Every structure is written in C-alpha cells, then in structure tokens.
C-alpha cells in the first residue's frame, strides 16, 4: 500500500512538473491574455509563496550573480536570460527592446522621461544609448519596485544619467518644470499603468512638456492593450503615429510599440 502511494505521489509530482515547466507555458505562448494570467498572476504568486521572496527580488539576485558590475549590456542579457529560461517578467523584453534601441539611437535624445520603471530593465536599455550629458527621469509608483530598480541601475553603472522618482505620474508631471528644471522632453517612454497612458499624455500636453518633434513611444499597446490611447494618437492632428508589430515580452503573442511624433 505504501509503495502504491509513493508511486502515485511520484507520478503526480512528475505530471505537475511537466505541466508547469512545458505544457502550460507552451499552450499560452500565443495567447497574450492567457500568458499574462499564467505568468503574471498564477506563477508569480506561487513562487512568491514558495520562496518567500518577490519576483523583482529574484530578478535582482540573477543580475548580481550573472551580470558584470558597470556593464549595462551584461545586465540586460542577465535579465533576458532570467525571463526566458527561469521566470517571466513584464519588462519590455529583448525583441521589443531592439525597437526601443533603434528609436533612441535615431533620436539621440538629451531629455527623456520614462513612465513606469518596474525593475529598471528599459531604464538601462535607454540610458546606455544616451549621449554624454543626457538626462533620463524615470517615474515609479510602486516603492518596492523602486528599491530593486535603484540597485539594478547602480549595478549597470548608469546612475549619472538616471534620476528615479517615486510617486504617481499625475502628481509628478505637473511639477517637472519647477522641480527638475525641464522645459520639454525629447522622448517619452510609456510603460506604466495602461489606463494612465491617455490621461498622462493629455496632462503632458497641458503642462507644455511636449515640443514639436517630441516622440512618445508606448509599450503593450496590443497586450494588455490601450485602445483609448491608440484612438487618440492615431486620429489627433497633433500626432503622426506608426505601429511597430512585435510580440509580448518573452512570448509569441502579438504585441507592439506605438511611436507618436508630437506635431505641436
């Protein structure tokens, strides 16, 4: 009887491992909503409970173990490897990250605003490409994420270009000119709460933070999606927009970036 029970437990354990490691991840690869539910809710909560740590903490540990201090590219590579082979995380990711890189390199901005820091992955991607003297202000609402992001930014050695600010975007955007001495931004990367994309864009317009030629680059416009934002920038005479088709980070589900040039 004991042998039967042990065999049953072993078989059940193997089945659960196969489901967790291969079958379910493979099944949700092409469906963005299911991928987010599986990776960003079910798996994250389970691992948080089992390890008594958070996903950002586990990501930071991987950076410190596998990335070279002071080497931004090695930090990016370490995070990408962690997210593809160990634990998914909602960074912009390697595929869309290349699109972000191309926009930053083409624009060569001196003043950049990032809305939504998370663990600092896109912050590092952007900052490593900025010219000398350039400035990147990144806003993060979640203080726990900000603690991790500061350490990732420091490990990458880009503190001289980055200023991380904790708080809500709607509170900080009106204070940008007075608090940071910023007149306008050359590039704004939107990757925070999706229902904030449109109101924050209108708030930046109203506060005079956008000049003719300012580029707004918005992530996750398909998955989870920002239909109200897309309708606005694609139909407004104040913007010229184009869509870069790609995939939700570290999956094969469709997602993309929307690049919108402010026309004044």
UniProtKB/Swiss-Prot annotation:
Its cofactor is Mg(2+). Substrate binds at residues 194, 220, 249. The keyword Signal applies. InterPro entries: Catechol_O-MeTrfase_euk, SAM-dependent_MTases_sf, SAM_O-MeTrfase. GO terms for cellular component: extracellular region. GO terms for biological process: catecholamine catabolic process; developmental process; dopamine metabolic process; methylation. Mg(2+) binds at residues 191, 219-220. Its main location: secreted. Strongly expressed in eye, diencephalon, spinal cord, hindbrain, liver, kidney and telencephalon. Also detected at very low levels in muscle, spleen, anterior gut and heart. In eye, expressed strongly in retina. In brain, expressed in the central part of the telencephalon, the periventricular gray zone of the optic tectum, the periglomerular nucleus, the olfactory bulb, and the region adjacent to the diencephalic ventricle in the hypothalamus. Expressed in gill, with strongest expression in gill filaments nearest the gill arch, and in esophageal epithelium. It comes from the Eukaryota. Its EC number is 2.1.1.6. Binds 1 Mg(2+) ion per subunit. CDD domains: AdoMet_MTases. It catalyses: a catechol + S-adenosyl-L-methionine = a guaiacol + S-adenosyl-L-homocysteine + H(+). Glycans are attached at residue 31. S-adenosyl-L-methionine binds at residues 92, 122, 140, 191. Keywords: Catecholamine metabolism, Glycoprotein, Magnesium, Metal-binding, Methyltransferase, Neurotransmitter degradation, S-adenosyl-L-methionine, Secreted, Signal, Transferase. Residues 1-29 form the signal peptide. It is found in: Secreted. GO terms for molecular function: catechol O-methyltransferase activity; magnesium ion binding. Belongs to the class I-like SAM-binding methyltransferase superfamily. Cation-dependent O-methyltransferase family. Catalyzes the O-methylation, and thereby the inactivation, of catecholamine neurotransmitters and catechol hormones. This is Catechol O-methyltransferase B. It comes from Danio rerio (Zebrafish).
